[in-house]
Amino acid sequence: QVFYLKLLVHFIGDMHQPMHAGRKADKGGNTIQVRWFNSGTNLHSVWDSKMLNHFDMSYTELAENLDVLSKKQVKFLQEGDIITWINETSGMAKKVYNSVEVGEKLGYNYMYNYFDVAELQLQKGGVRLAKVLNQLFG
Protein backbone atom coordinates (compact mmCIF):
# COMPACT_ATOMS: atom_id res chain seq x y z
CA GLN A 1 0.00 0.00 0.00
CA VAL A 2 2.92 2.35 0.69
CA PHE A 3 4.15 1.84 -2.87
CA TYR A 4 0.76 2.81 -4.30
CA LEU A 5 0.56 5.89 -2.08
CA LYS A 6 4.02 6.98 -3.27
CA LEU A 7 2.94 6.40 -6.85
CA LEU A 8 -0.19 8.52 -6.35
CA VAL A 9 1.78 11.36 -4.75
CA HIS A 10 4.31 11.27 -7.60
CA PHE A 11 1.60 11.11 -10.28
CA ILE A 12 -0.44 14.01 -8.91
CA GLY A 13 2.70 16.14 -8.59
CA ASP A 14 3.99 15.26 -12.04
CA MET A 15 0.70 16.03 -13.74
CA HIS A 16 1.16 19.69 -12.76
CA GLN A 17 4.55 20.06 -14.47
CA PRO A 18 3.62 21.52 -17.89
CA MET A 19 6.14 19.48 -19.86
CA HIS A 20 4.65 16.26 -18.49
CA ALA A 21 1.56 17.24 -20.47
CA GLY A 22 3.67 18.21 -23.46
CA ARG A 23 3.90 16.88 -26.97
CA LYS A 24 4.69 13.23 -27.59
CA ALA A 25 6.71 14.18 -30.69
CA ASP A 26 9.37 15.97 -28.64
CA LYS A 27 9.04 13.78 -25.55
CA GLY A 28 7.55 16.55 -23.45
CA GLY A 29 10.22 19.08 -24.33
CA ASN A 30 13.13 16.68 -23.81
CA THR A 31 14.33 17.15 -27.39
CA ILE A 32 13.96 20.95 -27.38
CA GLN A 33 17.45 22.18 -26.65
CA VAL A 34 17.85 25.55 -24.90
CA ARG A 35 20.53 27.39 -22.93
CA TRP A 36 19.89 27.91 -19.22
CA PHE A 37 22.23 30.62 -17.95
CA ASN A 38 24.79 29.61 -20.61
CA SER A 39 24.51 25.89 -19.86
CA GLY A 40 23.04 23.51 -22.41
CA THR A 41 19.88 21.71 -21.35
CA ASN A 42 16.36 21.02 -22.62
CA LEU A 43 13.00 22.65 -22.02
CA HIS A 44 11.71 19.71 -19.97
CA SER A 45 14.65 20.00 -17.59
CA VAL A 46 14.11 23.75 -17.17
CA TRP A 47 10.59 23.06 -15.92
CA ASP A 48 11.41 19.84 -14.07
CA SER A 49 14.25 21.23 -11.98
CA LYS A 50 16.38 24.08 -13.32
CA MET A 51 13.99 26.92 -12.44
CA LEU A 52 13.17 25.65 -8.97
CA ASN A 53 16.76 24.69 -8.16
CA HIS A 54 18.12 28.04 -9.35
CA PHE A 55 17.74 29.64 -5.92
CA ASP A 56 19.34 26.62 -4.22
CA MET A 57 16.56 26.36 -1.61
CA SER A 58 15.53 23.23 0.20
CA TYR A 59 11.97 21.99 -0.33
CA THR A 60 11.12 23.40 3.10
CA GLU A 61 12.53 26.82 2.21
CA LEU A 62 10.73 26.79 -1.11
CA ALA A 63 7.43 25.92 0.58
CA GLU A 64 7.95 28.63 3.21
CA ASN A 65 8.40 31.23 0.46
CA LEU A 66 5.11 30.38 -1.26
CA ASP A 67 2.14 32.64 -0.63
CA VAL A 68 -0.31 31.12 1.84
CA LEU A 69 -3.54 30.29 0.05
CA SER A 70 -6.88 31.29 1.52
CA LYS A 71 -9.59 28.67 2.00
CA LYS A 72 -11.41 30.22 -0.96
CA GLN A 73 -8.31 29.87 -3.16
CA VAL A 74 -7.81 26.27 -2.08
CA LYS A 75 -11.45 25.45 -2.82
CA PHE A 76 -11.14 27.06 -6.26
CA LEU A 77 -7.93 25.16 -7.09
CA GLN A 78 -9.48 21.87 -5.96
CA GLU A 79 -12.44 22.19 -8.33
CA GLY A 80 -12.73 19.61 -11.06
CA ASP A 81 -11.12 16.21 -11.29
CA ILE A 82 -7.92 14.65 -12.57
CA ILE A 83 -9.04 14.99 -16.21
CA THR A 84 -9.80 18.69 -15.68
CA TRP A 85 -6.41 19.19 -14.04
CA ILE A 86 -4.39 17.45 -16.75
CA ASN A 87 -6.26 19.41 -19.44
CA GLU A 88 -5.40 22.60 -17.58
CA THR A 89 -1.73 21.57 -17.46
CA SER A 90 -1.85 20.73 -21.15
CA GLY A 91 -3.03 24.27 -21.85
CA MET A 92 -0.13 25.56 -19.78
CA ALA A 93 2.25 23.37 -21.80
CA LYS A 94 1.13 25.12 -24.99
CA LYS A 95 2.04 28.48 -23.44
CA VAL A 96 5.43 27.12 -22.38
CA TYR A 97 6.13 25.83 -25.88
CA ASN A 98 5.21 29.22 -27.32
CA SER A 99 7.54 30.97 -24.87
CA VAL A 100 10.81 29.65 -26.33
CA GLU A 101 12.70 29.06 -29.53
CA VAL A 102 15.01 26.08 -30.02
CA GLY A 103 18.49 27.05 -28.85
CA GLU A 104 17.23 30.16 -27.06
CA LYS A 105 19.21 31.44 -24.08
CA LEU A 106 16.94 31.47 -21.04
CA GLY A 107 17.85 33.30 -17.86
CA TYR A 108 16.60 36.01 -15.56
CA ASN A 109 13.89 37.26 -17.94
CA TYR A 110 12.48 33.75 -18.25
CA MET A 111 12.65 33.33 -14.47
CA TYR A 112 10.83 36.64 -14.03
CA ASN A 113 8.08 35.59 -16.43
CA TYR A 114 7.64 31.96 -15.37
CA PHE A 115 8.91 31.30 -11.84
CA ASP A 116 5.57 32.35 -10.33
CA VAL A 117 3.83 29.99 -12.76
CA ALA A 118 6.06 27.13 -11.61
CA GLU A 119 5.33 27.96 -7.97
CA LEU A 120 1.58 28.07 -8.64
CA GLN A 121 1.77 24.68 -10.35
CA LEU A 122 3.46 23.31 -7.22
CA GLN A 123 0.71 24.75 -5.05
CA LYS A 124 -1.97 23.32 -7.30
CA GLY A 125 -0.33 19.91 -7.10
CA GLY A 126 -0.25 20.10 -3.32
CA VAL A 127 -3.83 21.20 -2.72
CA ARG A 128 -5.15 18.80 -5.32
CA LEU A 129 -3.19 15.93 -3.80
CA ALA A 130 -4.80 16.87 -0.48
CA LYS A 131 -8.23 16.64 -2.12
CA VAL A 132 -7.52 13.18 -3.53
CA LEU A 133 -6.06 11.92 -0.24
CA ASN A 134 -9.05 13.27 1.68
CA GLN A 135 -11.38 11.50 -0.75
CA LEU A 136 -9.48 8.24 -0.26
CA PHE A 137 -8.84 8.38 3.47
CA GLY A 138 -11.10 11.17 4.77
Where are the regions that the model predicts?
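Soluble secreted/lumenal catalytic domains
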Residues: Q1-F11, M15-T31, R35-S45, H54, ...
